[in-house]
């Protein structure tokens, strides 16, 4: 059925305006982004098919240009638009952290770190450098490694923290295996970094491990 023949209250845009964005399904949200369908499929049918083909919205969003454009009705222009939306979302989360106390918005912190690290194929060690009010000064990937390990050098972390004049750090890294449970090696390097940074009066506030659909906090476990 053409989407124009659907009841007005069931159309994605109208439904969003009347009930809010959280009332929409993944396919309905994607339909608003896509705007039009293809020959033989209205935009909702196309959205539903894309999500099923990729397995989830997340896998659709992390698809390469070639993978995305291989689907009927999807071209370079739509791929560019999607990447722009994702980048704006990431910047919004980063700005939210930089304007306030990172520790008063743990859900934003986890969401931001997950968006940065979750889909990486190799392990990456990421640091949020904070001022004395726990606001983000700078965030960056410090180390990248193989598919299952990243070498972390405490001396380099200390140098970078001093360069940014940081008062505290939040650490994060991903597990490409998808299993977020911290390893003994994760706990050891956290202790080494804590000890090294303490020599220059810089604290580690938390260490997050990002897996597939889960982010584990050392602080919440009482390990920091």
Swiss-Prot record:
Entry keywords, A to Z: Hydrolase, Metal-binding, Metalloprotease, Protease, Zinc
One GO MF term: metal ion binding
Listed transmembrane segments: none
Record region (Disordered): 1-21
Binding site residues for Zn(2+): 173, 175, 186
A Pfam family this chain is assigned to: RadC
Keyword Zinc: yes
UniProt short sequence motif JAMM motif, positions renumbered to this chain: 173-186
Domain MPN: start-end pairs: 102-224
Domain of life per record: Bacteria
GO biological-process terms attached to the record: proteolysis
Family annotation (SUPFAM superfamilies): JAB1/MPN domain (SSF102712), RuvA domain 2-like (SSF47781)
Family as reported in the entry's similarity comment: Belongs to the UPF0758 family.
PANTHER family (UniProt xref): DNA REPAIR PROTEIN RADC (PTHR30471), UPF0758 PROTEIN YEES-RELATED (PTHR30471:SF3)
Record-linked NCBIfam families: PRK00024.1, radc
Name of the protein described by the UniProt record: UPF0758 protein VS_0182
Biological classification of the source: Bacteria, Pseudomonadati, Pseudomonadota, Gammaproteobacteria, Vibrionales
């Amino acid at each position: 059925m053409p989407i124009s023949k659907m009841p007005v209250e069931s159309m994605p845009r109208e439904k969003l305006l009347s009930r809010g964005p959280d009332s929409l399904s993944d396919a309905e949200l994607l339909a608003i982004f896509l705007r039009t369908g293809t020959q033989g499929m209205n935009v909702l049918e196309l959205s539903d098919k894309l999500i099923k083909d990729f397995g989830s919205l997340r896998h659709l969003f992390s698809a390469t240009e070639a993978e995305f454009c291989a689907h009927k009705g999807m071209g370079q222009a739509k791929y560019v638009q999607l990447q722009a939306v994702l980048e704006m979302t990431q910047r919004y989360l980063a700005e939210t952290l930089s304007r306030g106390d990172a520790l008063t918005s743990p859900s934003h912190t986890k969401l931001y770190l997950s968006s940065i690290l979750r889909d990486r194929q190799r392990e990456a060690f990421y640091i949020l450098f904070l001022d004395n009010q726990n606001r983000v000064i700078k965030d960056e990937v410090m180390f990248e490694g193989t598919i299952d390990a990243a070498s972390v050098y405490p001396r380099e972390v200390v140098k970078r923290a001093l360069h940014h004049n940081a008062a505290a750090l939040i650490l994060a890294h991903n597990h490409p295996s998808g299993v977020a449970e911290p390893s003994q090696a994760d706990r050891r390097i956290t202790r080494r970094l804590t000890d090294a940074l303490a020599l220059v009066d810089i604290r580690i506030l938390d260490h997050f491990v990002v897996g597939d659909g889960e982010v584990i906090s050392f602080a919440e476990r009482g390990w920091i």
